[in-house]
Amino acid sequence: MLYPSIDSLMDKLDSKYTLVTVSAKRARELKEDDQRGPLVGKPKSFKPVGVALEEIVEDHLQYERKEQ
């Protein structure tokens, strides 16, 4: 079984599109900036995308939708 599950992630965000956008942006930040460490204490994943998903499920990442 994958961690975190898609169900637990969808409880935190409003759509799969938002999930992909937020996690990809955070993963890019983790990969490009060595001084930025993970926001979770000890991530289970070694890959930046997995770490970003763990941060989302543990409420370390927030997003704000801009109205147009």
Swiss-Prot record:
Pfam families: RNA_pol_Rpb6 (PF01192)
Enzyme Commission designation: 2.7.7.6
InterPro entries: DNA-dir_RNA_pol_omega, Pol_omega/Rpo6/RPB6, RPB6/omega-like_sf
Superkingdom per UniProt: Bacteria
UniProt feature coiled coil, ranges: none
An example Gene Ontology molecular-function term: DNA-directed RNA polymerase activity
SUPFAM superfamilies recorded: RPB6/omega subunit-like
Listed GO biological process terms: DNA-templated transcription
Reactions this protein catalyses: RNA(n) + a ribonucleoside 5'-triphosphate = RNA(n+1) + diphosphate
Protein keywords: DNA-directed RNA polymerase, Nucleotidyltransferase, Transcription, Transferase
One annotated Gene Ontology cellular component of this protein: DNA-directed RNA polymerase complex
Family: Belongs to the RNA polymerase subunit omega family.
Function of the molecule: Promotes RNA polymerase assembly. Latches the N- and C-terminal regions of the beta' subunit thereby facilitating its interaction with the beta and alpha subunits.
Description of how the protein assembles with itself and partners: The RNAP catalytic core consists of 2 alpha, 1 beta, 1 beta' and 1 omega subunit. When a sigma factor is associated with the core the holoenzyme is formed, which can initiate transcription.
Protein name: DNA-directed RNA polymerase subunit omega
The organism of origin for this protein: Halalkalibacterium halodurans (strain ATCC BAA-125 / DSM 18197 / FERM 7344 / JCM 9153 / C-125) (Bacillus halodurans)
